[in-house]
């Protein structure tokens, strides 16, 4: 009589990089014969992959851990908040194990201790697909090219959680991308803590892919990915000089004309306190140059308002910079002190909460007007759209200007499409964030 199949529940919180970590753990568990189940009550054990970037993320992680304990009782914690084991056990002393980010083997071992794999299990090739277990829809996938970060931004604790930059060999990255494309993926989203720095730690060493030499560097990686016939989107790009090298690839249609660059602020004084590159005037000139080379370029960014020491003058400088930059997609966060962040030791005057809220609201209104005007320019134009979902009201997709989850949507008036379809549409209407379209 065979033993029952061990069942694992999994909750993945935080950023796409954490999602990729979850996929890796789940792939290993599936290879060992575990079944992944969608409910707490059906699971023999629950793994919670946490986020610990800001206080609100930690609070969410603790809440989900508590929910899993209440509903199941057997909980293993991993991920970025796992580096603060005391903070987790102080609130939830009954968790079975706590591991940090990238500690895949420790997570799997902890699962083994709670519910061992089936001894008679013999992994078959068809049990786990070649691309591994994916938590995204079939038509797009995140491609993580490195771990860690060499920056020391004063508001951030990522290096203390995920360590210094460690780039994956370019041959491994490209082989994974090939497997994803063969499995039906039509959009690869390149992610890391710092995509522009890819290969710095390896001194851009030459690796091999399909028998051909390829340097472990962002430009060469992008050139190789562009040969796979799918959308390639770059995230978490720092505005180093080497970013200039990929703009011509975008202009030539080899990469999506999309850059996700976290500028964080524009005031030189605030950028210096943040320990960020403080060349906002040169950045504006570079944005102008990029758009001259690639007029279709979409730039997404994130900003922080209310950083300690930020004055009304600094904030107004940021608004004026946004007017000049005319960014397409923008997110904004109110500064939240993070335990262990160097910013706590700067001795700068904290910005009152009500002032942070006021600046956030003004920032969002300011950028909303910019976004609405830029999207209005697309009305009447034809673009390609990748369909994400279809319901009774029509299809919802994204253009090259829209990353999943964080950017806008294109609503297509058609009930004949399915997720993963790429279609050509004509834009008929726009608001502050989204577009409406009809099939061409």
From Swiss-Prot:
Pfam families this protein is in?
Radical_SAM, TRAM_2, UPF0004
Report the co-factor binding details: Binds 2 [4Fe-4S] clusters. One cluster is coordinated with 3 cysteines and an exchangeable S-adenosyl-L-methionine.
Q: Give the source lineage, highest ranks first.
A: Bacteria, Pseudomonadati, Pseudomonadota, Gammaproteobacteria, Pseudomonadales
List the GO cellular component terms.
cytosol
Domain MTTase N-terminal, by residue range, is 6-116
Q: Provide the top EC class.
A: transferase
- Role description: Catalyzes the methylthiolation of an aspartic acid residue of ribosomal protein uS12.
Q: Enumerate the subcellular locations listed in this protein's record, separating them with semicolons.
A: Cytoplasm
Q: Which GO terms describe its molecular function?
A: 4 iron, 4 sulfur cluster binding; aspartic acid methylthiotransferase activity; metal ion binding; protein methylthiotransferase activity
SMART domains in UniProt: Elp3
Q: Please give the catalytic activity noted in the UniProt record.
A: L-aspartate(89)-[ribosomal protein uS12]-hydrogen + (sulfur carrier)-SH + AH2 + 2 S-adenosyl-L-methionine = 3-methylsulfanyl-L-aspartate(89)-[ribosomal protein uS12]-hydrogen + (sulfur carrier)-H + 5'-deoxyadenosine + L-methionine + A + S-adenosyl-L-homocysteine + 2 H(+)
Q: Which Gene3D superfamilies match?
A: Methylthiotransferase, N-terminal domain, Nucleic acid-binding proteins, tm_1862 like domain
> This protein is called what?
Ribosomal protein uS12 methylthiotransferase RimO
Q: Which family does it belong to?
A: Belongs to the methylthiotransferase family. RimO subfamily.
The residues that the entry says bind [4Fe-4S] cluster 2 are 149, 153, 156
Q: Give residue ranges for domain Radical SAM core.
A: 135-373
Instruction: Name the cofactor(s) required for activity, per the record.
Output: [4Fe-4S] cluster
The Enzyme Commission number assigned here is 2.8.4.4
List positions binding [4Fe-4S] cluster 1.
Answer: 15, 51, 80
Q: Where is the TRAM domain?
A: 376-440
Q: Name one GO biological process term.
A: tRNA modification
What are the UniProt keywords, alphabetically? 4Fe-4S, Cytoplasm, Iron, Iron-sulfur, Metal-binding, S-adenosyl-L-methionine, Transferase
